[in-house]
Swiss-Prot record:
The keyword Cell division does not apply. The keyword Thylakoid does not apply. Residues 331-341, 353-366 have a biased composition (Low complexity). Residues 179-228, 250-307, 320-371 are annotated as: Disordered. Belongs to the eukaryotic RPC3/POLR3C RNA polymerase subunit family. Its main location: nucleus. It is found in: Nucleus. This is DNA-directed RNA polymerase III subunit rpc3. Residues 253-262, 321-330 have a biased composition (Polar residues). Component of the RNA polymerase III (Pol III) complex consisting of 17 subunits. GO terms for cellular component: RNA polymerase III complex. DNA-dependent RNA polymerase catalyzes the transcription of DNA into RNA using the four ribonucleoside triphosphates as substrates. Specific core component of RNA polymerase III which synthesizes small RNAs, such as 5S rRNA and tRNAs.
């Protein structure tokens, strides 16, 4: 309940009343089509149709609403009336994303983390995405580089190149991803989705493989742009000048005429124009060119190795002693060779013509594919991947727990293992990570350390055994009979991130229970976690609490939904004297209860902040328009008071959000 209230209040603070009405309707109603939204909100005194569309666009732009588009079923008459080339009639279903609205509380944490880990350029890029929600790559880099240029007064090309590198790193580290682009889906496609995923479509040759690769790339939200980037970063050293112009035009939004010299050197233009682009080669064209090139190379080798002397056939008779016959034979041989050479030249010219025709068509096809890919990449919108930030905060909490429980070396060892299997960790998943080998862990641990702080195999094996023996285990060693473990001398390990997060959540719950019910309440809670089901007398004896005080404490905790009561009757009439009353703890329910309490506290704190600032709203607006010399003493006191209250309440909200991260997002 309060989760929805907090999300609606955050949207209202950021986007105003009209957008909030649409978002609140989707939160309360759930998935709804545009027709239903329009009928519900466009009544008397409501929103206009145009305004509803604008509000939906704003919510989609800032990742607060997602949509699915479905093709409408048509009759035979309607199908016959369709105009070829026009899109099929469809309807969209919209759904609010409450979690993304809650994530807006954490934007200061996101910026602070990315600034310390990736640098100022990454922070500028993240701020632009926070302000605009979704942006194309060229516009994003252009706006972020302009901010950097104002601050440093550096050359624009150097700044743009640096931002391109940073943008690539953010994609590869999955902090930025492609915004989803849902396509219209029919009911038949929806029903056959599972069967289509199970089948692997080969595509019937090179064209099918190429199309399948592009479809896989489009479905991957972390795929790098195909033009202008490689897997290792921006393509800054490409020989083809046309590729340079196209890639720079995509990355910076500038025209290609600003980078290519107007008068290139002789031979350069000819060479670059004749060279096909390596970034977008069609497999089919390559195969056909390969076959032509093979037939040509046979004759090319003959031509290169052909001497200036005459080539004599084997069936020609040569008489060395008879000079006249030799001259006669040589004349005959010359005529024969001339005829063969003419046929050879004719075949070669025909092959050259066919090869040049194939090469020209393949170049045109490649140029068309490149141009289409440039257009497609320029339309791709990039947005923030909230899940990756939650994963980073989650791993930081695990590192702090391991360091606190063991020592600094165990924490560094945990970080080394996490770096090797980071891609298998999810923000809301408690399964084990992928396997990592002991040798790789040792290499990763010793990579950035001094020689005096490095570990050997015996030390790292000792630390891993300690982490495995802890309860619950932080790492799990694979069985020696498994293939992964037998291939490594130190064995293969998995990181138990789920176990560590479970203990962190339990510690958080225990701290809240101690604040609410004191040491006795905490002792009862931990006792029930260990023993599962206990009677009141057993709880009083084991927790060393007087029976009357223990009974009052139990009923107080049961009233707050901390513990629960289970009745086990010995007779069908459920008589009290013949019934066992056992208390137990349901930890997931307690976590859900405390999460709702935290949302309630955040909502009340935000309302308190509004009520504190409301009386001074007009005065604060006037203060922003005045100079420092014109501010009176009373106005300065009001400003200091409101600033102190604002900072205090915002700090409270951030601290509450830290607890919310552990209980709700992890």
């Amino acid at each position: 309940m309060y989760e929805q209230k907090v999300a609606i209040d955050i949207v209202k603070e950021s986007f105003g009343d009209d957008v909030t009405k649409v978002f609140e309707f989707l939160v309360q109603r759930g998935k709804s089509s545009y027709k239903i939204i329009n009928q519900s909100l466009s009544g008397k005194g409501g929103l206009t149709i145009k305004r509803i569309k604008q509000c939906l666009l704003v919510l989609i732009q800032h990742n607060l609403v997602t949509y699915e588009e479905f093709l409408l079923p048509l009759t035979k008459d309607e199908i016959e009336k369709l105009v070829p080339g026009e899109p099929l009639p469809s309807d969209s279903v919209y759904e609010a994303i409450i979690v993304n609205a809650i994530h807006r509380l954490r934007f200061p944490k996101f910026i602070n983390y990315i600034k310390h880990s990736k640098g100022d350029e990454a922070a500028y890029i993240l701020e632009e995405l926070i302000d605009h929600g979704r942006l194309p790559m060229d516009l994003l880099i252009k706006q972020a580089s302009q901010i950097q240029r104002v601050d440093t007064f550096e050359d624009q090309d150097d700044i743009t190149k640096r931002f391109e590198d940073t943008f690539t790193k953010l994609i590869m580290d999955q902090f930025i991803m492609r915004a989803p682009r849902p396509r219209p889906v029919s009911d038949q496609e929806t029903s056959n989705a599972l069967s289509k995923e199970a089948k692997k479509v080969g595509g019937g040759g090179a064209n099918g493989n190429n199309v399948g690769a592009h479809q896989k790339k489009d479905s991957d939200p972390f795929a790098l742009p195909s033009v202008g980037f490689s897997s290792n970063g921006p393509l800054s050293s490409v020989d083809n000048s046309a590729n340079d112009a196209e890639s720079l035009e995509i990355l910076t939004g500038k025209s290609s005429t600003t980078t290519i010299p107007s008068q290139p050197k002789k031979g350069t233009a000819k060479k670059t124009s004749a060279k096909p682009k390596s970034t977008a080669i069609n497999t089919t064209a390559t195969a056909s060119l390969g076959r032509k090139r093979k037939s040509r190379d046979i004759y090319d080798e003959d031509d290169d190795e052909e001497p200036d002397l005459l080539v004599i056939e084997e069936n020609v008779e040569i008489n060395v002693n008879d000079h006249n016959s030799a001259n006669k034979n040589s004349t005959t041989t010359t005529t024969t060779t001339t005829t063969k050479t003419g046929q050879h030249t004719l075949k070669k010219s025909k092959l050259d013509q066919s090869s040049s025709t194939t090469t020209t068509s393949s170049r045109q096809q490649q140029n068309g594919m490149d141009q289409q890919r440039i257009i497609d990449e320029s339309r791709v919108l990039w947005t923030i991947n909230y899940e990756q930030f939650i994963i980073e905060f989650k791993l930081k909490a695990c590192y702090d727990f391991v360091t606190e429980k063991n020592n600094q070396q165990s924490g560094l060892l945990f970080n080394a293992m996490v770096k090797l299997c980071k891609r298998s960790i999810r923000s809301n998943q408690d399964s084990l990570t992928s396997c990592v080998y002991g040798e790789n862990i040792l290499e990763e641990y010793n990579r950035d350390l001094d020689s005096s702080k490095k570990m050997d195999k015996l030390q790292i094996e000792k630390y891993l055994s300690i982490m495995q023996a802890s309860r619950p285990s932080m790492v799990t060693k694979m069985v020696s009979k498994s293939k992964q473990s037998s291939s490594s001398e130190l064995g293969a390990y998995q990181v138990n991130v789920g176990n560590i997060i479970g203990i962190i959540k339990q510690k958080m719950v225990e701290s809240i229970i101690k604040q609410k019910f004191g040491d006795n309440g905490l002792r009862v809670f931990k006792l029930l976690l260990i023993k599962n089901l206990l009677e009141p007398k057993q709880i009083a004896e084991l927790a060393m609490i007087p029976p009357n005080e223990c009974k009052a404490l139990l009923f107080n905790m049961m009233q707050k939904n901390i513990i629960r009561l289970q009745e086990i009757p010995r007779s069908s009439d459920h008589f009290a004297n013949r019934t066992f009353y056992l208390f137990f703890v349901d930890l997931p329910t307690i976590i859900a209860t405390f999460t709702e309490d935290i949302f309630k506290a955040i909502y009340n704190t935000r309302e308190r902040l509004k009520s504190e600032l409301e009386p001074h709203k007009d005065a604060l607006e006037k203060l922003t328009q005045l100079d420092e010399d014109q501010i009176t003493e009373d106005q300065a006191k009001i400003y200091k008071k409101t600033d102190r209250i604002t900072q205090t309440l915002l700090t409270v909200i951030l601290n509450l959000d830290n607890d919310l991260l552990h209980l709700y997002s992890f």
